[in-house]
């Protein structure tokens, strides 16, 4: 693993710049240290009467963004949650889930942790912020507890994943993004997948799903978990199918159950489980143009038709919940019947399954298991709102987690843009987490650069939705960017962007190619020194 050690632990290469500082905010209830990045600005900016010479940024990079931490991938990350002194098994006789404690009125370390993360040390700014007349308050541990107790938010954090830095998924919080990685029978290695997982976190992924279907599924997952500061999700059906020799008809409940327990023991934080696809839905799916495009859904459909029996994930769902409850694993109820083409969007198969997911949500909550609902898929723009409205109504306001939606079927090679457009819209309506799509979607297995493109595109979508929802911290970052842009403070512009390394390199190369070597020019190569609108606007304002 020598190469992967270098590739995942090396600092990001920067061009003549001061890297963001890693800072830690301490808890007041528990002995927590919540990591963030702090960007030092080249000047002091005044926003709404407050001075900002630096800005704390939400950081998903964990120890990888702290140059003072030495990381050995073979040993894994520090198990930070082991030192928090909250012994769940001593406090609960039957359940140790976040929802259990939330319903009991107990704040856990994870609840305080995510409240600190969401505020980013900007409580004063948040309290003074107002857009459209609505006042906003900082996130408190008590508010987090209430949202989890009501099922409107989840903290996916398996007790066996102590390396994890807790995060929260819910529509009252920052919109999150997930990055899918994983090998296939046709390519990739453990080293490559670990590298993609780590760099997903460094580029801004809030969770990572390991969707490996090829060789060494168990070992790949173990390496990823021990080196991941973000929640890891899986689709257990993939490994169960491997154990069944790749034959859907050979699957059994016992095989699947044992796979669940195996992955739970390793520390997987949330499982996608396709328990909502039923025999009654299959005739509707067979009428579609593109049928069933979910891998897990197609596996279960084949099993049901072969055995002429109901989906065992549905009939055994209470037993599944009892397993998840023991480890505090969240369930992501999979949309086995998501549309794979816009012609199939919002059909009877899709919404029929969604109603079943709502029923299963209530079952999971009975066992105090945290739930989120997976959504489409391929949906044209004008049909996206209906998906959000129906999810809230059918699924009792459980967090929605969507794959896009992709708004057209003809964007192959650019499906990360396709997905980000639909994702921005549905997130502005209340979707809690967006599953990224890379440029390789529909074409092949993504490499590290594809992962980067997918993550950043969906960070743009999530941030845009946060602005639409009036998130004060997001608005501050945009205002500071605009002030830096109008001041020609290039280094501040780089550091306040979602991908500082890329835009810094693009700017430097563009200027150098045209013979400009100025450190802080009052123009860029788009307009040049004589046609810069902001430069002329400033000059006009300064004229008497």
UniProtKB/Swiss-Prot annotation:
Q: Report the catalytic activity.
A: 5-amino-1-(5-phospho-beta-D-ribosyl)imidazole + S-adenosyl-L-methionine = 4-amino-2-methyl-5-(phosphooxymethyl)pyrimidine + CO + 5'-deoxyadenosine + formate + L-methionine + 3 H(+)
Annotated binding of [4Fe-4S] cluster, by residue: 524, 527, 532
Residues in a coiled coil are none
| Keywords carried by this UniProt record | 4Fe-4S, Iron, Iron-sulfur, Lyase, Metal-binding, S-adenosyl-L-methionine, Thiamine biosynthesis, Zinc
How many and how are cofactors bound here? Binds 1 [4Fe-4S] cluster per subunit. The cluster is coordinated with 3 cysteines and an exchangeable S-adenosyl-L-methionine.
Going by the entry's taxonomy, the superkingdom of the source organism is recorded as Bacteria
User: What are the GO BP annotations of this UniProt entry?
Assistant: thiamine biosynthetic process; thiamine diphosphate biosynthetic process
Q: Which residues bind substrate?
A: 180, 209, 238, 274, 294-296, 335-338, 374, 401
Q: In which pathway does it act?
A: Cofactor biosynthesis; thiamine diphosphate biosynthesis
Please name the NCBIfam families in this protein's record. PRK09284.1, PRK13352.1, thiC
Q: What is this protein called?
A: Phosphomethylpyrimidine synthase
Organism whose genome encodes this protein: Pelodictyon phaeoclathratiforme (strain DSM 5477 / BU-1)
Q: What is the lineage of its organism?
A: Bacteria, Pseudomonadati, Chlorobiota, Chlorobiia, Chlorobiales
């Amino acid at each position: 693993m020598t190469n992967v050690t270098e590739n995942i632990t090396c600092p990001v290469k920067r061009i003549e710049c001061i890297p963001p500082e890693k800072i830690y905010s301490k808890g007041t209830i528990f002995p927590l240290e919540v990591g963030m990045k702090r960007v030092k600005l080249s000047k002091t900016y005044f926003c709404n009467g407050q001075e900002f010479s630096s800005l704390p940024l939400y950081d998903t990079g964990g120890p990888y963004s702290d140059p003072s931490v030495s990381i050995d991938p073979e040993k894994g990350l520090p198990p930070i949650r082991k030192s928090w002194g909250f012994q769940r098994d001593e406090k609960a006789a039957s359940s140790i889930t976040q929802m259990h404690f939330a319903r009991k009125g107990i704040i856990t370390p994870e609840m305080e942790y995510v409240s600190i993360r969401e505020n980013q040390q900007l409580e004063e700014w948040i309290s003074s912020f107002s857009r459209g007349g609505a006042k906003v308050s900082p996130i408190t541990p008590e508010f987090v507890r209430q949202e989890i107790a009501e099922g409107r938010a989840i903290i996916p954090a398996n007790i066996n994943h102590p390396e994890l830095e807790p995060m929260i998924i819910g529509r009252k919080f920052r919109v999150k993004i997930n990055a899918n990685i994983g090998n296939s029978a046709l390519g990739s290695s453990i080293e490559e997948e670990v590298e993609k997982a780590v760099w997903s976190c460094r580029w801004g992924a809030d969770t990572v799903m390991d969707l490996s279907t090829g060789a060494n599924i168990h070992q790949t997952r173990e390496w990823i978990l021990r080196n991941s500061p973000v929640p890891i999700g899986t689709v257990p059906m993939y490994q169960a199918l491997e154990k069944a020799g790749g034959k859907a008809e050979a699957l059994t409940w016992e095989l699947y159950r044992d796979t669940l327990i195996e992955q739970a023991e390793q520390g997987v934080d949330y499982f996608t489980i396709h328990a909502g696809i039923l025999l009654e839905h299959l005739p509707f799916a067979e009428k579609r143009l593109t049928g069933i495009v979910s891998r897990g859904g197609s596996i279960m459909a084949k099993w049901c038709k072969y055995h002429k029996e109901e989906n065992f994930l549905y009939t055994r769902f209470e037993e599944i919940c009892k397993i998840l409850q023991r480890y505090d694993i969240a369930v992501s109820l999979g949309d086995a019947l998501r549309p794979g083409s816009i012609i199939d969007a919002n059909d009877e198969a899709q919404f029929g399954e969604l109603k079943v997911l709502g029923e299963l949500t209530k079952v999971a909550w009975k066992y105090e298991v945290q739930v989120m609902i997976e959504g489409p898929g391929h949906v044209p723009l004008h049909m996206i709102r209906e998906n959000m409205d129906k999810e809230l109504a059918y699924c009792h306001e459980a967090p929605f987690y969507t794959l896009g939606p992709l708004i057209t079927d003809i964007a192959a090679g650019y499906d990360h843009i396709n997905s980000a457009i639909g994702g921005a819209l549905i997130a502005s309506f209340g979707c809690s987490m967006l599953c990224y799509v890379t440029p390789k979607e529909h074409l092949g297995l993504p490499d590290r650069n594809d992962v980067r493109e997918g993550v950043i595109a969906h960070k743009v979508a999530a941030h845009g939705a946060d602005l639409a929802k009036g998130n004060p911290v997001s608005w501050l970052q945009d205002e500071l960017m605009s002030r830096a842009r109008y001041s020609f403070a290039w280094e501040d512009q780089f550091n306040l962007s979602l991908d500082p390394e890329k835009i810094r390199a693009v700017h430097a190369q563009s200027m150098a190619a045209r013979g400009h070597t100025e450190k802080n020019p009052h123009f860029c190569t788009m307009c040049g020194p004589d046609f810069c609108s902001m430069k002329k606007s400033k000059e006009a304002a300064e004229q008497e």
